Amino acid sequence: MNEVFESYLTYSAGVRQFTKATIDSYKNDLIIFEEWLKELDLNIFELKASDIRIFIAELADKKIAPASINRMMSTLRGFYKYALRFNLTKMNPISSVRNLKLAQKLPVFMFPKQAQEFCRLPSNAGILWETRDAALFASLYSTGCRVSELAGLDIKDLDKTLSYAIVFGKGKKERKVFFAEFAKEYLREYLKERSDLVEKFKGQVQKDGKGKIRDTLFINQKAQPLTSRGIRYIIDRYVELSPELKHLSPHAFRHSFASTLITRGADIRVVQELLGHESVSTTQRYTHITAEQLQNLYKTAHPHS
């Protein structure tokens, strides 16, 4: 890979402290961009906005999804900001290039009853680790955490009464999230079993991707940290058992958390804080969900609808 791209990735990982998943995503985007530059024999620091638009058009011709193209543009914006900051260039060809318009899709979510039924699903399914999986689902729904945030949660981040936890979101921003009573019950049961399992595998120290010792809250059956990918796999296994929720994604727990709060009258700024959104406009997507819910309820219940 181009030396300048490599230095940008090193900077993003070390100074900006972006996650490994983010760095991997940036790397993939830059590899695609570099291949395109080589094909046309172009210099990265001599490009014009028109060149970037041609690159976008070629990606679209290859049926790359608009959201993926926009993500790639975000990667390039970050790179050129870095290049400008360290005087590698005086030009930013992407500054005037707009993102592609995306079709507005409402987030997939569960109603409270569905979410609680999903949390009870492991006890009847007889697959994987029932107690852990119930605690995992209840924690996702109760806190509104991202999957990556829950995977990054250590025992030390929990309040002693299990009332709340401190999580680290995007950009390493710290926030407090809360566990509902039903989630606390699932967690207490899981923590007992977890303690027994850790004792069984005593001596096999938990380590993260960087080799640092951890005491991760959610672990696999070998007492090692459960990764974001592992959590997604677990959710997918249970979704297979629920035909009515076949389109459910791991992020749906977070969507369900937000829509439940807003439906019950929570202030949108409070919901924004609990979700860790930088902009309230991101949180406002969930007001569209509740508006649709009300409309459907009206159609079902009103005699003259």
Curated annotation (Swiss-Prot):
InterPro entries associated with the record: CB, DNA_brk_join_enz, Integrase-like_cat_sf, Integrase_catalytic, Integrase_recombinase_N, Integrase_SAM-like_N, Tyrosine_recombinase_XerC/XerD, Tyrosine_recombinase_XerCD
Tyr recombinase domain boundaries: 105-299
Compartment(s): Cytoplasm
GO annotations of cellular component type: cytoplasm
Record-level Gene Ontology MF annotations: DNA binding; tyrosine-based site-specific recombinase activity
Active site: R146, K170, H251, R254, H277, Y286
Gene Ontology biological process: cell division; chromosome segregation; DNA transposition
Transmembrane segments: none
Domain Core-binding (CB) positions: 1-84
Record key words, sorted: Cell cycle, Cell division, Chromosome partition, Cytoplasm, DNA integration, DNA recombination, DNA-binding
SUPFAM superfamilies recorded: DNA breaking-rejoining enzymes
HAMAP family, alphabetized: Recomb_XerC_XerD (MF_01808)
Subunit text: Forms a cyclic heterotetrameric complex composed of two molecules of XerC and two molecules of XerD.
Function statement: Site-specific tyrosine recombinase, which acts by catalyzing the cutting and rejoining of the recombining DNA molecules. The XerC-XerD complex is essential to convert dimers of the bacterial chromosome into monomers to permit their segregation at cell division. It also contributes to the segregational stability of plasmids.
Family: Belongs to the 'phage' integrase family. XerC subfamily.
Name the record gives this protein: Tyrosine recombinase XerC
Organism: Treponema denticola (strain ATCC 35405 / DSM 14222 / CIP 103919 / JCM 8153 / KCTC 15104)
Gene from which the chain derives: xerC
